[in-house]
Amino acid sequence: MKFEKGRVFDVAHMIDYAEGGVVSKELSHNDAGSVTLFSFDAGQQLSEHTAPFDALLQVVEGEMELSVEGKVNVVKAGEAFVIPNGARHSVSAAKPFKMII
């Protein structure tokens, strides 16, 4: 499901949780980059990795634990975080959460 340009949409309701899993939905993709919506069930994680560009993420439901260069940050619904390019980062879900990045 893609979002309609020029329309208001509810990001949190565009994706469901999968029991014991992570779900991703690419909402937009072009030469400048992409926008992806994720849902993480409790206990799930994304292992440490880097990206060659800054990444802005916003939690749209729940809260996540985001480790950036070894520092753990708790990011809650409505809050955002910019991950600097090249920074080692990982994600974990103590509770279910949804984010857009």
Named regions from a protein language model:
Residues 39-41, 51-66:
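Short, conserved beta-strand element in jelly-roll/cupin
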Residues 85-101:
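Ligand-binding loop in jelly-roll beta-barrel domains
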Residues 1-32, 67:
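A short, N-terminal "cap"/entry segment at the start of jelly-roll beta-barrel domains
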Residues 20-21, 36-51:
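Conserved short histidine dyad/triad with adjacent acidic residue
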Residues 60-61, 76-77, 95:
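A cytosolic small-molecule/anion-sensing beta-strand core signal
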Residues 70-85:
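Short acidic-glycine-tyrosine-enriched beta hairpin
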